[in-house]
Amino acid sequence: PKISLGPELSVGVPALAEPFEAWLTGYDEDIPHRWNLFLPEGFSITGSTVVDGLPGTEEAKSLGKWCRASSCILALRGGESGPALQECLDELKTEGTVLSFGKGPDLPSGFFRLVMEDPAQRGPGVLVKALAAREVITGWPDVFILREAVGSLFLPEDGGEPRVLPLAEPLRVPDGEDERA
């Protein structure tokens, strides 16, 4: 099969739930389960979507074009972030580099969740450059960034915070069946 991965990441940036695309000559619902049996520990296929379109049509657009947004966790290494990071994120939101950011009840103190559009153009490197330009950090060693999701952008009608939705439906694992058993 032809396989391609989602928007690239800078070296050293860990990621969760990264999309990949596989062009197959045939597909059945058991393929993701069978592939999981052979993937290295720490890797698993958690969802799948069949895109059935002729080359060159909107349905068959490249994976990069499906990936409209990313969500990442950001924190400064070595302690609390202080007001400088929050001020910088406010500026990045005002200028449109960051769609939203917040501390979130599920995050430790000093950590922020950010949603950004167009992950192929606005990745972790953009954040590091902006933070360094504003002298919040000196460079990569001063910051922790985890890309937690890449997918479609969901903008709530009620004006709530934007979210990143996965591109694939979760796999269905029959009750009592372990994926790697």
Q: What is the predicted role of each segment?
A:
Residues G12-L16, K65-C67, L107-P108:
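Short, flexible turn/loop "capping" segments at secondary-structure junctions
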